[in-house]
Structures are given as structure tokens and as C-alpha cells.
């Protein structure tokens, strides 16, 4: 595994570019603390059995209204107004394109009802489509699969999909299609305390996410073993690895730091024990890091 992780500095720089909002060259050195290589055994596999939506159990947490005071609301409104003003100024600065430069109006193909809001706010919707025409759509907190004609092939809750007895609810799902490996990857979370936080990573066994089955990994969300829980995951793949970023919070829901997990996706596709490292204490203490997958030299 040493060779797998020796070029991490390149990936970390790519992962952190989104926080710079600049395309100028920089000599800034970005550093991070690297954990030991961790081996996570596969928690099992799941063979999909759909659930009739009329009987699909949905568990929603009681909402907490924010902000809690008029002063807080005034501050939020002022920030929104300032952002809207900056956005409009940016739009006004963009020159109007010449008529010949305008692109042709896209033609709508198949149109069908998608994965509806299950009552969570925010919706946290994510969708991926394969070269073979399979569509995997996730929201808080359900999953649906279709073909490109709009035929529903599978419906379930996220907890029902991962099929782990200790997981009764899941949230913050993200799904992507890995066009190099012709597989799907789905990541979701469970638990909002250091002792209950779980990071669930699922790999489709074949190119068919409906009938081919999935490998499921149940990772401790307290990734640094310092009594923090994992939130706001974002994902990306390279030729050999899966990157998952997330924000760590204390038991009092106070932000601690953002971290990056680097996992061996090839092992995940085979259901083997999966190697991973965690990167923390990143230069500049960025928050809400968005991983960037590099180009694969092929297209959808």
C-alpha cells in the first residue's frame, strides 16, 4: 500500500484548490497530518429487494428553527442581501455574447418523475447515471433506481439499502458513477454523536446496481479517535482511489476541522479488506472541502 499513498500531496493540493477561488500559480506549501494505514473489513453485501413506497418507513428528526432571535434574522437577511448584490454585480460585468456564439437550445429527451423530497431539509439530493443507462438517485433519506426510460427499478430507505442491523436511519447521501471501473459508489452517514457516528461506503459489485449487489463498509465516523463525529461528506474518485472529505464536530456540535479520507477503491469493488488513511490538520484549517476527481481520459 505504500506506493498507493505516496503521491497524496498532489491530490491534497487538488482537493484544496476549491478554497482558493484563484487560478494563479502559488508557491504556498499545503501540509497535513497523515494517519496510519487502516484496514476496514467489508461489513457484508446487500442484494437489493425493493420496498413498496406505500410501506417505506421514513424517520425525520424534529426540526430546530434557526436563527432564534430577531437580531440573528436581521444578520442573516443582511448577509443574503450583500451576497445577492455581489452576484448581480458579477452578472452585470459579464459581456453579452454575440448571437453567433450562442449555443443551440437543448432538446428535452425522456421526462419522468424523479426522486421526490422525503421531508428532510435540505434535500441533499445526488444522482449518477452509467454508460449502461442505469440511474441511481438518492435524497435524505431514500434511494431509487431507474432506467433511462424512467422505469422505476428499485426503491428503499437508505437504512434499508445498506442492510446493517445497527443502522436505523441514514442521511447526507452522495452517489457517483465511476466510468473507469463501470461501477457505482454510494456514501451515506448515520449518527450525530461521536459514539454513534458511522460513515457507510457502498460499492456496486457489477455495472448493474439493481441485480448485481453491493459491497458495504461500515466505518467509524470518529475517524481521528478524538470524540468527534463526521458530517457533510463529499466524494470523488481517481483511477485507484476514493476520496471522502467531511467536517468533524464535537459532542456539542462545535466545528473542529475538515478531514480527507483516502480509500483504495479497487479493494472496495472486490469486497476485500479496504486500506485507507485520514488526512487532518490541513494548512489554513479549511472548512467544507470539496474533493476534485482528475480526468480519466475517457468520457460518458
Explain the meaning of each model-derived region:
Residues 25-300:
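C-terminal PAP-associated
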Residues 1-28:
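Bacterial Sec-dependent N-terminal signal peptides
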Amino acid at each position: 500500500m505504500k506506493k498507493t499513498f505516496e503521491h497524496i500531496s498532489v491530490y491534497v493540493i487538488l482537493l484544496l484548490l476549491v478554497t482558493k477561488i484563484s487560478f494563479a500559480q502559488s508557491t504556498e506549501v499545503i501540509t497535513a497530518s497523515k494517519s496510519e494505514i487502516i484496514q476496514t473489513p467489508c461489513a457484508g453485501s446487500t442484494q437489493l429487494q425493493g420496498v413498496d413506497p406505500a410501506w417505506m418507513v421514513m424517520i425525520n428528526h424534529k426540526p430546530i428553527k434557526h436563527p432564534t432571535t430577531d437580531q440573528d434574522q436581521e444578520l442573516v437577511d443582511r448577509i443574503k442581501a450583500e451576497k445577492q448584490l455581489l452576484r448581480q454585480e458579477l452578472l452585470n460585468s459579464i459581456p453579452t455574447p454575440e448571437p453567433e456564439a450562442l449555443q443551440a437550445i437543448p432538446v428535452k429527451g425522456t421526462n419522468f418523475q424523479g426522486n421526490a423530497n422525503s421531508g428532510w431539509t435540505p434535500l441533499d439530493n445526488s444522482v449518477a447515471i452509467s454508460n449502461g443507462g442505469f440511474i441511481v438517485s438518492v435524497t435524505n433519506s431514500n434511494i431509487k433506481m431507474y432506467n433511462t426510460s424512467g422505469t422505476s427499478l428499485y426503491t428503499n430507505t437508505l437504512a434499508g439499502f445498506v442492510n446493517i442491523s445497527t443502522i436505523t436511519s441514514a442521511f447526507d447521501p452522495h452517489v457517483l458513477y465511476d466510468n473507469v471501473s463501470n461501477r457505482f459508489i454510494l456514501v451515506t452517514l448515520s449518527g450525530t454523536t461521536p459514539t454513534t457516528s458511522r460513515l457507510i461506503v457502498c460499492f456496486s459489485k457489477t455495472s448493474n446496481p439493481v441485480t448485481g449487489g453491493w459491497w458495504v463498509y461500515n466505518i467509524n465516523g470518529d475517524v481521528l479517535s478524538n470524540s468527534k463525529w463526521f458530517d457533510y461528506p463529499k466524494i470523488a474518485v481517481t483511477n485507484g482511489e476514493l476520496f471522502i472529505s467531511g467536517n468533524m464536530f464535537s459532542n456539542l456540535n462545535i466545528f473542529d476541522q475538515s478531514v480527507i479520507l483516502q480509500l483504495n477503491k479497487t479493494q472496495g469493488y472486490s469486497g476485500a479488506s479496504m486500506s485507507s488513511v485520514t488526512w487532518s490538520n490541513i494548512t489554513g484549517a479549511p472548512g467544507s472541502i470539496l474533493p476534485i476527481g482528475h480526468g480519466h481520459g475517457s468520457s460518458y
